[in-house]
Structure formats: C-alpha cells, structure tokens
Amino acid sequence: IGPYYDDGDVDALTPADRLGRFLIENFVPHGYGVAQVSVFGTGESNHCMDLMGLDEQRGIHAAVEYLGSAPFSNGGVGIIGKSYDGSTPWEAAAMGSEYLKTIIPMSGLIGAHDLMWRNGSMEARGAIMHNGVYGSFGLDGDLEDAENACEGYLEGYYAGPAAYLSGD
C-alpha cells in the first residue's frame, strides 16, 4: 500500500514494477494473492493525499477490511513494503483489524513527525519530499487534480521558514 502504483489500469494483467513482480513470482505460487493499493491522492485513487494522517490510515484500514472479507479471500491479509510502503504496514497495524495477520515494514517510518519537524520548525526535506514529491503523485493534468490537491500543502512550504524567522 503506497503512492507508487500509478499504472492507472485496474484491469492490468502485469504488476507495477515496484514490489509487485517480486511478490507475484515468489508468493502467488505458494497460494497467496497480491493486491497493489494506492494511498489517497495517488495512482487512480482520489481524495487529498493525507501523508500518514488519519484519512490515509482509514483508507488503508478499508483496504485491509475489503481484502480480508472478500469472497476470494481466506481472511488473512499481510502487508509488505519498503520506504513509504514500509510505513503503511504500521498504519494498518495501528488501526487494528481481525484480518491483518502480519506486516513486513522495511525502511519505513512509524510516524512522520520526526522526519518533518525539528526544533519546532518544518525541515526543508519534509516540505520538498513529502508535500512536493508525494503531493505531486496525484496530479496528472486531468480534471480530477483539484480533488487531489490539499489546501494545506502550500502552507507547508512557508510555515517552517516563517516560524524560524519570526520565532513563533
């Protein structure tokens, strides 16, 4: 579960290259299913991207509940990922679900606060990487972009430096 699945074709017969091919080649032969799920505001999802926020957690929880209760499912869901995708398993575990049986988070964050803020001010890498890079994943030049643009993103670029300069 992450922001990297931008193939945009729900009927695709091949996986996104990120972890999908590895998972399909190594897990499917042993009876596991693989689903690649985009967080809000990325891929073909809509909504404002809520970087590791409550809305993102609710979306991840909804995906776990759906996959665990689907007719094709045996009721067991596991989540694996690295980098951003390595953070989403923790979000799923924090929400709690009878269907979530295991998580394999690799090189992810337990929370974004320490990455985004230092000494009461937003770090430049926080605004650039997360608001800029991840925030742009939901923007692809179509009419739905307005739904994916978060009103607080622009604030993130000036709030940290302004607080630092003003002492607030």
Predicted feature residues:
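Accessory cap/linker subdomain of secreted extracellular hydrolases
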Residues: D17-L23, P29, E91-D168
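Beta-sheet entry/capping signal
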Residues: G33-V34, G75-G78, Y99-I103
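Short, solvent-exposed turn/loop segments enriched in Gly/Ser/Thr/Pro and often Arg
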Residues: S38-G43, G53, G81-G86, S107-L109
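Alpha/beta-hydrolase fold nucleophile elbow
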Residues: P71-Y84
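Short glycine-/acidic-enriched loop or helix-start segments at secondary-structure transitions
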Residues: V10, N46, P89, D114-L115
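Short, basic, helix/turn surface patches
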Residues: G59-G68, G75, G108, M129-S136
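Cap/lid segment of the alpha/beta-hydrolase catalytic domain
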Residues: I1-G68
